[in-house]
Amino acid sequence: MVQDRLFQKAISVLLIAGYEVSERCAIRPRSFDLIAEKGGLLLIIKVSSPIDNVSEEIARDLDLIAGHLEGSPLIIGGRARDTDLERGAVYLRYGIIAINPETLYDYLVDGIPPLVYASPGGLYVNINGDVLRGLREQRNMSLGDLGAVLGVSRRTISKYESGMGTTLEIAIKIEEVFDSGVIESIDLLKYTSHFANKPQERLPVQALAVLERIGLELHALRRAPFQALATFEGEMILTGYGTAQKVVKRAGLIGNLSAITHTHAMCVAIDGSIRKKVGQTLIIGEEELHDIEDGEELIELFD
């Protein structure tokens, strides 16, 4: 019930903000639940409460999908362990931003970005180090002078000016001292991957060999409704595979996701001879793939 309410809140906020929202992904396993798009901006969204349920495996999928679709991964939740997520605060789960629906509303609808982020020990803010240094120098204050006023060391002030975050309490003191803003807001749509040397999953040998033979580059996923992202000369294909019965069930959802992300959708049936379109999705048998000469010929089948 809690999860359903979160879904409804998240979808409502996205629609109010003018986003086109995909169907809810109800297929298990799933690394994301929704994809939303507005003016070329893509959000890959996982709804989870508590946010601790988002595993590293799920986060890696979110990261990989966001990277290749040039989107921003986002976790929408209500709690972290036994604590409610605070409005206007950002939480991190394996480097993926997590917020509550109210913070999403403030950002997307009212244009109010969050200012604080949660970290062990409490809530923190980012300080604009260049602004802080400029204000300090205008007052002819040394690092030690400002440190004495704030009750911290000169080395800590130096770190603030180099970009280190601080507690909300200290940041407020700084702004009171200079009567000027130094706190930097957090851009929810600015994402930098925290995963290095991402392990590549291998697709089943036959499907992998056929698609690679015709020149496609493949990126396997573990928990998405499509098992791979395939690329060919700038064209992206959301690719699923499995028995004919299985891929027909997934074809509609994968097609809907491809429409939102402005990509192609393909399902490879490994147990039959078939080639047809179901909505946006090309369903093709593995045998038919063997007859395709190259990636360009495959792309033409989507038209």
Curated annotation (Swiss-Prot):
Family matches, as CDD domains: HTH_XRE
PROSITE patterns: HTH_CROC1 (PS50943)
Source species, domain of life: Archaea
DNA-binding region: 143-162
TM regions (residue ranges): none
Key words, A-Z: DNA-binding, Transcription, Transcription regulation
InterPro entries linked to this entry: Arc_TR_HTH (IPR020886), Cro/C1-type_HTH (IPR001387), Lambda_DNA-bd_dom_sf (IPR010982)
UniProt KW Transcription keyword: yes
Residues covered by the HTH cro/C1-type domain: 132-189
Keyword Cell cycle in annotation: no
SMART domains from the UniProt entry: HTH_XRE
Molecular-function annotations in GO: DNA binding; DNA-binding transcription factor activity
UniProt-recorded name of the protein: Putative HTH-type transcriptional regulatory protein Mpal_0031
